[in-house]
């Protein structure tokens, strides 16, 4: 729609049929070329009802609205023409002024409604006085000659571009792309802009064509000098001081601006300056840092995320469920003391501890004098080096390899640093003495992990010197947590904090008080020894406190009233456990049992305690990569440098009724429980990613995730289940307790260095003789073995004979005899002698047979490939892009693959038989005289070409 067009005539009655019977308000507004607000106002004026843009109106109301809006438009157009009619008849001074004055629209009221599809008809309107332009006649007169030529060649509806004034473009261009003459470069910038507008006011509706690509219907299209100046003032921006020389004229308001005009200045960002100074980009390419310690900030973020997740996380188990599951599980601890029989330290003793729940091993620990754990030991170390960029310090603890102390593990209150100025280089200096505790054993090339936040573990609680808060395990019921809080208010000293363990459930106040007093006395002894060593300045690290053996630690942390019994095999282990339990928990002595391995009547030794409880068998299966589920599914556990990945497969489990969703969900539920058991048994720590089989229903996915979370409630170490990723992967983190099962009983392979592969200098050809790749698995295993055995039997039954001439070869003689018998039967009808057929058979070149066999083989492969492609397409359509075919491994279900294997094997035999017919020296295989190879019916495509049978009539 073009401004200046007069209102069209009222619609004819025939136009009423163009509107539908019923339409919405916004559709009617779009049809009439106006806004929904004006249509709603017209409807309210007609019947007084309040409607919205989505209300429905019938054809009668739509016609009334159209007539009403057309009447208002016609009245507004007549009034506008009558007011300015005397001024429009004035004679302009020149043709240029005529074109300029007739097309200027300054503050002239435009009709709000214009019917669609009406041809634009310009009407004469006067030129309103422009208050913003002071020297309009001067520059119009100066440029009349130059613009006259441009107006003669310019079309009436030429679209003008805003290339010079658009965002992101320079303002120093003075080209003639908009019809401006070259000699305008000497004029002020304001005069250039306004002269261009005066020369092209006939197409002012296209000033903002780059902003509105859809058309010119809903835009204000006046094109006057005042409107153009306002738009230019809004878009005017001042560049930086290092801009072009042409921007000097833009410092401050332009001459055509009214008084008190504000020029907005866009201050570039620091990132933009850095990016533009190098490569002109708008994004920052510099690495940014944070104020303070990065590790402390990461620690704060983890705490915030943990608190937020704790608020959103629903309770995993209620108190009743917690107590019921705790009492329902039968827990037994078995300890075995053995002598090492393999190098490098044969003859040394080691101890194994296994925790069984309902007869299934869920946790395993191993300890020896040579591989004692350092976790919990307290040392007076000496700072060797401080790395501010890594926010870490290396501390000598007297164990050969330096330990690493990160900034997040520094006790800042003890160091006298608080607030934001927490930098490790301010707290520690090389040569300083520092009391540290080992929080993680050295692994591989990494040293021990250290912390200055010392904690002493007791039987019922953990004593934290210098802390001011108390914590209670979330695994305890709410009522028990409240009881323990009241006890701690009276027991815990003001200069220390405690963390209540799950073993303190139901414990009396006197026992907790005694545990706190014992741990506090131990800490005072450690402080006194550290102070004495500092005064001596011996210059060497000193061990202030060492944790007891792993056997004692496991008994202290795990063995409580929940266990049915503790079975011990070995005199040394029995003496250690019996002495500790009598001193710490005399009420649990009745649950101790010593296993005696008496010899049998025939002199054979009794089975081992681990053999009796089938622990060795379960440990051997736990060291395998693949784990079988009770229903037949499998888990594949792979350990990488960054994380542990677990893949869930259905394996042999095909379901017992129901549909695929039920089968997959049942398999995933079993996998969730077994995954938690494997994590505890193998002591897997770090990031764990689980790939469950895809489920369609959201309720089933929530059920599997809930089962996984409930199973993890039995794990005593710290863990956290994160959200499910967009790919359907479940990710969680778990803290390792000690040495893992596989790490304790394995070493890296000397051949492949633990990679599991052997590298060769040349590429390895993994293709079989048939030209197809060998596919490992159970689908083709049976059939492939059968085919190979039959092929080997065929080869064993043939004899090696010298090469014959083509005509004397026994194969051709047998073929000739067969053809002669066929010809003999056909002589009665056709009368052809059999000798001719024999001659034709004898004269046939051997290459024809070779080609025939090759053609049969190629035809077989093509047919099988077509069938396989069809099956694959059908599977893709049925699964709807769900990746279930990799997870669902159904054995012996693809008969087409077996048939293709049979055809390929037959084709191989045919090729081998025909290989020696080309006259090459050597030996060929011929059937033996005394034994015949077993035959098998062959498929049609392998025996003869496709088509109807050929009759020799």
From Swiss-Prot:
SMART domains: S1. Pfam families: RNase_E_G (PF10150). GO terms for cellular component: cytoplasm; cytosol; peptidoglycan-based cell wall; plasma membrane. GO terms for molecular function: metal ion binding; RNA nuclease activity; rRNA binding. Its EC number is 3.1.26.12. Zn(2+) binds at residues 749, 752. It comes from the Bacteria. InterPro entries: NA-bd_OB-fold (IPR012340), RNA-bd_AU-1/RNase_E/G (IPR019307), RNase_E/G (IPR004659), S1_domain (IPR003029). Residues 376-453 form the S1 motif domain. Residues 157-169, 230-240 have a biased composition (Basic residues). Residues 127-150, 199-223, 848-915 have a biased composition (Acidic residues). Transmembrane segments: none annotated. Residues 183-193 have a biased composition (Polar residues). It catalyses: Endonucleolytic cleavage of single-stranded RNA in A- and U-rich regions. SUPFAM superfamilies: Nucleic acid-binding proteins. Residues 14-23, 263-272, 294-311 have a biased composition (Basic and acidic residues). Its main location: cytoplasm. Keywords: Cytoplasm, Hydrolase, Magnesium, Metal-binding, mRNA processing, RNA-binding, rRNA processing, rRNA-binding, tRNA processing, Zinc. Disruption phenotype: Essential, it cannot be deleted. Depletion experiments show a decrease in growth rate, decreased processing of furA-katG operon mRNA and decreased expression levels of many transcripts, accounting for the metabolic decrease. Cells are more sensitive to isoniazid (INH). Murine macrophage infection is impaired. Mg(2+) binds at residues 647, 691. Residues 1-23, 118-314, 766-808, 822-953 are annotated as: Disordered. Its cofactor is Mg(2+); Zn(2+). Endoribonuclease that plays a central role in RNA processing and decay. Plays a major role in pre-16S rRNA maturation, probably generating the mature 5'-end, and a minor role in pre-5S and pre-23S rRNA maturation. Probably also processes tRNA. RNase E and HupB jointly contribute to cellular adaptation to changing growth conditions and survival during antibiotic treatment and in the host. Assembles into a homotetramer formed by a dimer of dimers. Interacts with DNA-binding protein HU (hupB). Belongs to the RNase E/G family. This is Ribonuclease E.
């Amino acid at each position: 729609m073009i401004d200046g067009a007069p209102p069209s005539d009222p619609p004819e009655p025939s136009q009423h049929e163009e509107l539908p019977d019923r339409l919405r308000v916004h559709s009617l507004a779009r049809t009439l070329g106006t806004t929904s607000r004006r249509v709603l106002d017209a409807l309210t004026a007609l019947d007084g009802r309040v409607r919205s843009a989505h209300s429905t109106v019938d054809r009668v109301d739509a016609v009334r609205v159209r007539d009403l809006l057309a009447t208002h438009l016609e009245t507004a157009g007549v009034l506008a023409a009558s007011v300015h009619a005397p001024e429009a008849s004035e004679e302009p001074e020149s043709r240029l002024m005529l074109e300029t004055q007739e097309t200027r629209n300054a503050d002239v009221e435009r009709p709000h409604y214009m019917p669609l599809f009406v041809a634009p008809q310009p009407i004469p309107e006067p030129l309103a006085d422009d208050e913003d332009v002071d020297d309009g006649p001067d520059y119009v007169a100066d440029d009349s000659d130059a613009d006259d030529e441009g107006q003669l060649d310019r079309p009436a509806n030429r679209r003008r571009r805003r290339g010079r004034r658009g965002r992101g473009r320079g303002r120093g261009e003075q080209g003639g792309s908009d019809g401006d003459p070259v000699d305008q470069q000497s004029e002020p910038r304001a005069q250039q802009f306004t002269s261009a507008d005066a020369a092209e006011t006939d197409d002012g509706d296209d000033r903002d064509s780059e902003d509105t690509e859809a058309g010119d219907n809903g835009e204000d299209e006046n094109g006057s000098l005042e409107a153009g100046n306002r738009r230019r003032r809004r878009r005017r921006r001042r560049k930086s001081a290092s801009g072009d020389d042409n921007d000097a004229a833009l410092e401050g308001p332009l001459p055509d601006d009214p008084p008190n005009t504000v020029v907005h200045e866009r201050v570039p960002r620091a990132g933009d300056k850095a990016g533009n100074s190098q490569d002109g980009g708008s994004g920052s390419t510099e690495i940014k840092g944070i104020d303070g310690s990065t590790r402390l900030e990461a620690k704060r973020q983890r705490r915030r995320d943990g608190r937020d997740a704790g608020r959103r996380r629903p309770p995993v188990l209620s108190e009743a469920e917690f107590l019921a599951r705790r009492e329902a599980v039968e827990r037994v601890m078995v300890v075995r003391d053995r002598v090492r029989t393999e190098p490098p330290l044969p003859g040394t003793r080691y101890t194994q501890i296994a925790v069984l729940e309902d007869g299934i091993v869920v946790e395993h620990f191993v300890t020896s004098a040579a591989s004692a754990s350092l976790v919990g030991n307290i040392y007076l170390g000496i700072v060797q080096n401080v790395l501010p960029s890594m926010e870490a310090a290396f501390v000598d603890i007297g164990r050969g390899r330096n330990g690493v102390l990160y900034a997040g593990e520094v006790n800042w209150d003890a160091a006298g640093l608080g607030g934001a100025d927490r930098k490790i280089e301010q707290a520690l200096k090389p040569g300083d003495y520092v009391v540290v505790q080992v929080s993680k054993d050295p692994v591989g090339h990494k040293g021990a992990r250290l912390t200055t936040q010392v904690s002493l573990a007791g039987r019922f609680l953990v004593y934290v010197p210098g802390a001011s808060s108390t914590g209670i395990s979330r695994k305890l019921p709410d009522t028990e947590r409240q009881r323990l809080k009241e006890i701690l208010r009276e027991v815990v000293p003001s200069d220390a904090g405690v963390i209540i363990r799950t073993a303190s459930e139901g414990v009396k106040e006197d026992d907790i008080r005694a545990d706190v007093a014992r741990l506090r006395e131990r800490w005072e002894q450690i402080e006194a020894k550290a102070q004495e060593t500092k005064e001596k300045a011996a210059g060497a690290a000193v061990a202030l406190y060492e944790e007891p053996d792993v056997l004692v630690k496991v008994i202290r942390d795990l063995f409580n009233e929940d266990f049915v019994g503790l079975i011990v095999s070995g005199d040394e282990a029995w003496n250690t456990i019996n002495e500790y339990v009598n001193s710490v928990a005399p009420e649990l002595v009745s649950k101790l049992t010593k296993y005696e391995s008496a010899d049998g009547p025939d002199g054979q030794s009794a089975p081992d305690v681990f053999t009796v409880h089938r622990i060795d068998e379960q440990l051997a299966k736990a060291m395998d990569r693949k784990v079988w589920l009770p229903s037949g599914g499998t888990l594949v556990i792979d350990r990488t440098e960054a994380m542990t990945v677990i893949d869930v497969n259905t394996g042999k489990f095909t379901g017992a009724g129901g549909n695929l969703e039920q089968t997959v969900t049942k398999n995933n539920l079993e996998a969730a429980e077994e995954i938690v058991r494997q994590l505890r048994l193998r002591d897997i720590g770090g990031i764990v990613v689980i790939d469950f089989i895809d489920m369609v229903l959201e309720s089933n996915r929530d059920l599997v995730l809930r089962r996984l979370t409930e199973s993890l409630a039995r794990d005593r170490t710290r863990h956290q289940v994160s959200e499910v990723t967009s790919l359907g992967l479940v990710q969680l983190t778990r803290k390792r307790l000690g040495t893992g099962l596989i790490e304790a009983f394995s070493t890296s392979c000397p051949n492949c260095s633990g990679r599991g592969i052997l590298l060769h200098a040349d590429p390895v050809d993994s293709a079989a003789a048939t030209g197809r790749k060998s596919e490992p698995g159970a689908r083709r295993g049976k059939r492939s073995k059968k085919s190979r055995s039959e092929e080997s039997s065929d080869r064993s039954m043939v004899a090696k004979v010298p090469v014959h001439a083509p005509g004397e070869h026994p194969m051709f003689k047998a073929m000739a005899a067969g053809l002669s018998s066929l010809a003999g039967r056909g002589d009665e009808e056709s009368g052809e002698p059999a000798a001719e057929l024999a001659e034709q058979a004898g004269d046939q070149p051997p290459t024809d047979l070779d080609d025939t066999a090759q053609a049969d083989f190629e035809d077989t492969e093509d047919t099988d490939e077509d069938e396989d492609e069809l099956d694959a397409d059908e599977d893709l359509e049925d699964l709807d892009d769900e990746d279930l075919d990799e997870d669902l491994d159904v054995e012996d279900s693809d008969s087409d693959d077996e048939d293709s294997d049979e055809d390929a094997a037959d084709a191989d035999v045919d090729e081998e038989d025909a290989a020696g017919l080309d006259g090459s020296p050597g030996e060929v295989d011929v059937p033996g005289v005394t034994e015949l190879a077993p035959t098998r019916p062959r498929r049609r495509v392998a025996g003869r070409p496709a088509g109807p049978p050929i009759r020799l009539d």
